[in-house]
């Protein structure tokens, strides 16, 4: 069956966004939605700017990620207006004129200076819901970020349109290309820095383009959850490799993690295989009506069951969970929403009018507490780690007998394991966005 083009998907996406904006503006009592793309920020006491990061509320409407000082304006009943900043500048590369599948659906105005936007913005700033950072202020147009508007728009962002799913799939394909190159570099004995460079070259994106800093961790560095140091020399002997790395596609992110053992016959490889199989089952449980908090708790029990089988735990999974021992080995959340942002917004939202669904007691790092609904895209990223700081807490809290410390010492040089896919919640079975791409890569 022929796939719809991005142009037709974008047209439907825009209808969804305008309907959401209509409702959000009505709730907030505003007449216009105004979204600045953001501006460049300069380092303290220097003339060097930080890497530009586009306002997520802006790139939700148009696939533009490198256009500071631009604006999106929507008034109910009218086409969206894009005020596109294209300066006269011989110091830097100037953005190309707008083109692509989206341009026929918006009214586009080119400006040469930021101040020229003033003539194109709605006449009465006080009637505008302006979503942005304080530095985007232009004259009377000061970002006010009205809570009723944000609550509604951010809650609805959890439900991805077919257009958004298409871009998330592209981001998966790019990232998997990088993951394959990174694994090959690891097998060839490269350093963390060398593996990182192989990844970036394969994806065609550098640190300013990637949705987050690559985690390239060899051996015991895999026990640092967000390890980003990139060692210049490969450790000897080379035991393990944990990579958590994504890619960007027109403003949408992927977030994928894999773990590899240098020795395919090692106990660590067997542990990877067990976590991988459990992760796949967890992803299949992403279904409408399922409470993500419960998936997180079930992940703890599954992982502790694996550690029990491998002789790391001496107590039952239930006992490890009840005493907090499980959190020493699996100290983060099972996953999060993903889309325009890696950790997408409204993961705790009780409704589109605000409110908060709290995390379960004893699980302070879970980033998603909502009940799953069709259209949500979540990560499923269970992990098992051997972290000295957390294992010391197990001993201090009187639970040393729950752990076989000899087995812990055997696994510590490998750092840890994390496996992460993106999964779509549908009306039926879960759709894993990541596994099929690896299978065909």
Curated annotation (Swiss-Prot):
* Annotated residues for binding of Mn(2+) 1: 255, 336, 381, 420
The cofactor named in the record is: Mn(2+)
What's a BP term from Gene Ontology annotated to this protein?
proteolysis
Q: How is the cofactor bound?
A: Binds 2 manganese ions per subunit.
Q: Where does Mn(2+) 2 bind?
A: 244, 255, 420
Q: Which UniProt keywords apply?
A: Dipeptidase, Hydrolase, Manganese, Metal-binding, Metalloprotease, Protease
Which superkingdom?
A: Bacteria
Alphabetically, the GO molecular function entries are: aminopeptidase activity; metal ion binding; metalloexopeptidase activity; phosphoric triester hydrolase activity; proline dipeptidase activity
According to its UniProt record, which reaction does this protein catalyse? Xaa-L-Pro dipeptide + H2O = an L-alpha-amino acid + L-proline
Q: Which Gene Ontology cellular component annotation is one that this UniProt entry carries?
A: cytosol
Record Pfam families: PepQ_N, Peptidase_M24
User: Record's SUPFAM superfamilies?
Assistant: Creatinase/aminopeptidase
EC number(s) on file: 3.4.13.9
Q: Which InterPro entries match?
A: Creatin/AminoP/Spt16_N, Creatinase/aminopeptidase-like, PepQ_N, Pept_M24, Peptidase_M24B_aminopep-P_CS, X-Pro_dipept-like, X_Pro_dipept
User: Function of this protein?
Assistant: Splits dipeptides with a prolyl residue in the C-terminal position.
Q: Which NCBIfam families does this one have?
A: PRK13607.1
Q: Which family does it belong to?
A: Belongs to the peptidase M24B family. Bacterial-type prolidase subfamily.
Xref: PANTHER family: XAA-PRO AMINOPEPTIDASE 3 (PTHR43226), XAA-PRO DIPEPTIDASE (PTHR43226:SF8)
What's the name of the protein? Xaa-Pro dipeptidase
> What gene, per UniProt, encodes this protein?
pepQ
